Amino acid sequence: MAQDGVELEKSVRRLREKFHGKVSPKKAGALMRKFGSDHTGVGRSIVYGVKQKDGQELSNDLDAQDPPEDMKQDQDIQAVATSLLPLTQANLRMFQRAQDDLIPAVDRQFACSSCDHVWWRRVPQRKEVSRCRKCRKRYEPVPLDKMWGLAEFHCPKCRHNFRGWAQMGSPSPCYGCGFPVYPTRILPPRWDRDLDRRSTHTHSCSAADCYNRREPHVPGTSCAHPKSRKQNHLPKVLHPSNPHISSGSTVATCLSQGGLVDDLDHLILEDLKEEEEEEEEEEEDGGPRE
């Protein structure tokens, strides 16, 4: 797919995500082709149309800017705005975020136990789903209290702040005073790009199978450090993601498959290629795959 095709697909997916998938791919594609992939302008014009057509007192709470005249008068935009009515307390925030060109997103960890594959993705906050690149199955994120990786610690005893490999809920000794400290959060890979910020300390924790175990250890616990996992012949996945059961409303967006390290355009091309392959397989098999 050419670069302009990638830009068109990105704009279609972003426009659809702004309105939580309520704009069909066909309508979004037509609008993006008509207005040069300007998802920001079209999104704001749709919000303006909703505000003008709604007529309720609630519409006064929606801060909608006056769009360009060609978009304001466009019948396709007006039709989409009409289809999104009525304005309610529940969808007011969606329209306001679309007006502000915002798509709330979060960085989440995913893990496929079948492939022993772990990855991070920035996903839309309202629909946290990602696909394993190896088996192509879709998964929910790893629960927040089960995440593992590079963790951030704040020692309550000596006030020392440090980083180290851990799983949420498993204590590690403070490098300053040795006091057992629980991690406050797991950091996405991009947080560790700056080599100067990496810890110079050798990993050590209280897990029973840690390669550099600190005593007293905690029986029945497992070390999250890759070296311990490899040394003990354990899988990379400490806690698997649950398979995603589709409700039919998931919007495949550039955010939903946007890697934290990889190039965005490459990922969208890869995502489109995978979708084409899935469609071909469905045709060959005579129906959709489970």
Curated annotation (Swiss-Prot):
<dbReference type="GO" id="GO:0006449">
    <property type="term" value="P:regulation of translational termination"/>
</dbReference>
<dbReference type="GO" id="GO:0005829">
    <property type="term" value="C:cytosol"/>
</dbReference>
<dbReference type="GO" id="GO:0051607">
    <property type="term" value="P:defense response to virus"/>
</dbReference>
<dbReference type="GO" id="GO:0005654">
    <property type="term" value="C:nucleoplasm"/>
</dbReference>
<dbReference type="GO" id="GO:0034340">
    <property type="term" value="P:response to type I interferon"/>
</dbReference>
<protein>
    <recommendedName>
        <fullName>Shiftless antiviral inhibitor of ribosomal frameshifting protein homolog</fullName>
    </recommendedName>
</protein>
<dbReference type="GO" id="GO:2001125">
    <property type="term" value="P:negative regulation of translational frameshifting"/>
</dbReference>
<feature type="region of interest" description="Interaction with PABPC1">
    <location>
        <begin position="102"/>
        <end position="150"/>
    </location>
</feature>
<dbReference type="GO" id="GO:0005737">
    <property type="term" value="C:cytoplasm"/>
</dbReference>
<feature type="short sequence motif" description="Nuclear localization signal">
    <location>
        <begin position="121"/>
        <end position="137"/>
    </location>
</feature>
<dbReference type="Pfam" id="PF15135">
    <property type="entry name" value="UPF0515"/>
</dbReference>
<dbReference type="GO" id="GO:0075523">
    <property type="term" value="P:viral translational frameshifting"/>
</dbReference>
<feature type="region of interest" description="Disordered">
    <location>
        <begin position="269"/>
        <end position="290"/>
    </location>
</feature>
<comment type="function">
    <text>Inhibits programmed -1 ribosomal frameshifting (-1PRF) of a variety of mRNAs from viruses and cellular genes. Interacts with the -1PRF signal of target mRNA and translating ribosomes and causes premature translation termination at the frameshifting site. May exhibit antiviral activity.</text>
</comment>
<keyword id="KW-0051">Antiviral defense</keyword>
<dbReference type="GO" id="GO:0034342">
    <property type="term" value="P:response to type III interferon"/>
</dbReference>
<feature type="region of interest" description="Disordered">
    <location>
        <begin position="221"/>
        <end position="242"/>
    </location>
</feature>
<comment type="subunit">
    <text>Interacts with PABPC1. Found in a complex with PABPC1 and LARP1. Interacts with ELAV1, MOV10 and UPF1; the interactions increase in presence of RNA. Binds to ribosomes. Interacts with GSPT1.</text>
</comment>
<comment type="similarity">
    <text>Belongs to the SHFL family.</text>
</comment>
<dbReference type="GO" id="GO:0035456">
    <property type="term" value="P:response to interferon-beta"/>
</dbReference>
<dbReference type="GO" id="GO:0045071">
    <property type="term" value="P:negative regulation of viral genome replication"/>
</dbReference>
<dbReference type="GO" id="GO:0043022">
    <property type="term" value="F:ribosome binding"/>
</dbReference>
<keyword id="KW-0963">Cytoplasm</keyword>
<keyword id="KW-0694">RNA-binding</keyword>
<feature type="region of interest" description="Disordered">
    <location>
        <begin position="51"/>
        <end position="71"/>
    </location>
</feature>
<feature type="compositionally biased region" description="Acidic residues">
    <location>
        <begin position="272"/>
        <end position="290"/>
    </location>
</feature>
<dbReference type="GO" id="GO:1990825">
    <property type="term" value="F:sequence-specific mRNA binding"/>
</dbReference>
<dbReference type="InterPro" id="IPR026795">
    <property type="entry name" value="SHFL"/>
</dbReference>
<dbReference type="GO" id="GO:0034341">
    <property type="term" value="P:response to type II interferon"/>
</dbReference>
<dbReference type="GO" id="GO:0000932">
    <property type="term" value="C:P-body"/>
</dbReference>
<dbReference type="GO" id="GO:0005634">
    <property type="term" value="C:nucleus"/>
</dbReference>
<dbReference type="GO" id="GO:0003723">
    <property type="term" value="F:RNA binding"/>
</dbReference>
<keyword id="KW-0539">Nucleus</keyword>
<feature type="short sequence motif" description="Nuclear export signal">
    <location>
        <begin position="261"/>
        <end position="269"/>
    </location>
</feature>
